[in-house]
Amino acid sequence: MEGDLAYIGAGLAGMGTGIAALGVGNVAANFLAGALRNPSAAASQTATLFIGIAFAEALGIFSFLVALLLMFAV
């Protein structure tokens, strides 16, 4: 029974990886919308874009690691 609950928890934590992908898409879409409105400011904002993508992707990686820990360590 405890093993089954670990797999359910791992599945729920694994959904965080997909949600992080949605977050990365949202960051990129908003950057593109802003860059199309003001092309002269787009070049100075690319570093901010990459930082935002890195933070969103880091949350996905952390949720993936939690899922792996729940599956194999618990």
Swiss-Prot record:
Gene3D superfamilies: F1F0 ATP synthase subunit C. One of its GO terms (cellular component) is plasma membrane. Keywords: ATP synthesis, Cell inner membrane, Cell membrane, CF(0), Hydrogen ion transport, Ion transport, Lipid-binding, Membrane, Transmembrane, Transmembrane helix, Transport. Pfam families: ATP-synt_C. One of its GO terms (molecular function) is lipid binding. The chain crosses the membrane at residues 5-25, 49-69. It is found in: Cell inner membrane. F(1)F(0) ATP synthase produces ATP from ADP in the presence of a proton or sodium gradient. F-type ATPases consist of two structural domains, F(1) containing the extramembraneous catalytic core and F(0) containing the membrane proton channel, linked together by a central stalk and a peripheral stalk. During catalysis, ATP synthesis in the catalytic domain of F(1) is coupled via a rotary mechanism of the central stalk subunits to proton translocation. This is ATP synthase subunit c. It comes from Ruegeria sp. (strain TM1040) (Silicibacter sp.).
